[in-house]
């Protein structure tokens, strides 16, 4: 399974790339806002930081106010020219899907986002989108069981040998990462703190303290590993 970082903060991305071996980045307008920097400044930073780095997709979302395919294609084409790493992120609406089809014709990779059902996930795969992003956290917050919905998308894609990669998005904790892995999703994208939490466990800390105490009480005749 691939790990993408859901962030627009360069310091977080750099740390995760260097230390966690993340495979890509996803952004959205909210993450851009939280970075405290203008949209184009963030894109310029990304393009510079990862220039020459291959197979490291960075999903950049177009202006969410655009509501027709022509305008989406026009803006997305300009964004794609800024970096070979950029993937154009577009909403799963009818105009968005029409735009995605045109992008793929032009050889521009797309990430169809804001997907909340298997039926929505079908058309992105049919038109050859590079990625599709079904959301988990928002649905679970409303009381929905998301495990089966992700499994259904995975199974449908297998039935028809679709090449679109599934990015399970809006994850809130380590359990949701595991659920996505068990369902067979290709990728998860999480915030910095969610990954940090997923690397930890209370019993790991408990066991480490016990081993430290044992180490400190071990009598040795000579210093070890000086």
UniProtKB/Swiss-Prot annotation:
Gene3D superfamilies: Aldolase class I. Disulfide bonds: none annotated. PANTHER family: FRUCTOSE-6-PHOSPHATE ALDOLASE 1-RELATED, TRANSALDOLASE. GO terms for molecular function: aldehyde-lyase activity; transaldolase activity. The keyword Lipid metabolism does not apply. Homodecamer; dimer of pentamers. The keyword Kinase does not apply. The active site is at residue 89. It catalyses: 6-deoxy-6-sulfo-D-fructose + D-glyceraldehyde 3-phosphate = D-fructose 6-phosphate + (2S)-3-sulfolactaldehyde; 6-deoxy-6-sulfo-D-fructose + D-erythrose 4-phosphate = (2S)-3-sulfolactaldehyde + D-sedoheptulose 7-phosphate. This is 6-deoxy-6-sulfo-D-fructose transaldolase. It is an enzyme of class 2 (transferase). Its EC number is 2.2.1.14. It comes from the Bacteria. It comes from Priestia megaterium (strain ATCC 12872 / QMB1551) (Bacillus megaterium). Keywords: Carbohydrate metabolism, Schiff base, Transferase. CDD domains: Transaldolase_FSA (cd00956). Part of the sulfo-TAL (or sulfo-SFT) pathway, a D-sulfoquinovose degradation pathway that produces sulfolactate (SL). Catalyzes the conversion of 6-deoxy-6-sulfo-D-fructose (SF) and glyceraldehyde 3-phosphate (GAP) into fructose-6-phosphate (F6P) and 3-sulfolactaldehyde (SLA). Can also catalyze the SF-cleavage with erythrose 4-phosphate (E4P) as acceptor, forming 3-sulfolactaldehyde (SLA) and sedoheptulose 7-phosphate (S7P). Belongs to the transaldolase family. Pfam families: TAL_FSA. One of its GO terms (biological process) is carbohydrate metabolic process.
